[in-house]
Amino acid sequence: MAIERTFSILKPDATKRNLTGAINALIEQAGLRIVAQKRIRMTRDQAETFYAVHKARPFFGELVDFMVSGPVVVQVLEGEGAVLKYRDVMGATDPSKAADGTIRKAHAQSIGENSVHGSDAPETAAIEIAQFFSGNEIVG
């Protein structure tokens, strides 16, 4: 498999409970490297742009409100097959269906407060990374 990058967000429910270190440990144990990371408070405009694909969905407003409710940690992860590997590490969106050992099984509180976001494809990852990081902020 090729070395690739993916984008990750540790959501407000995770940062509120000081889970950054615990989640980072699971990421690194899976063989992924954190090559960029910063803690930010997402603006409403950033959240609406980031989740624009869901704009017509009934949960869009609630999702945006949640993402601006507290700090998030945005990350760039790197490794072999990083997109799929991180999706495996995250686990199912519904924590009750997530496998043991996954981030969501261990830390998510609900489908909505599911602790993390990860890109769904390499192309999406590139777009998402560019929304939050400049090239010189990514140090591989």
Swiss-Prot record:
GO terms for molecular function: ATP binding; metal ion binding; nucleoside diphosphate kinase activity. ATP binds at residues 11, 59, 87, 93, 104, 114. GO terms for biological process: CTP biosynthetic process; GTP biosynthetic process; UTP biosynthetic process. It is an enzyme of class 2 (transferase). Its main location: cytoplasm. NCBIfam families: PRK00668.1 (NF001908). Major role in the synthesis of nucleoside triphosphates other than ATP. The ATP gamma phosphate is transferred to the NDP beta phosphate via a ping-pong mechanism, using a phosphorylated active-site intermediate. Homotetramer. This is Nucleoside diphosphate kinase. The lineage of its organism: Bacteria, Pseudomonadati, Pseudomonadota, Alphaproteobacteria, Hyphomicrobiales. The gene is ndk.
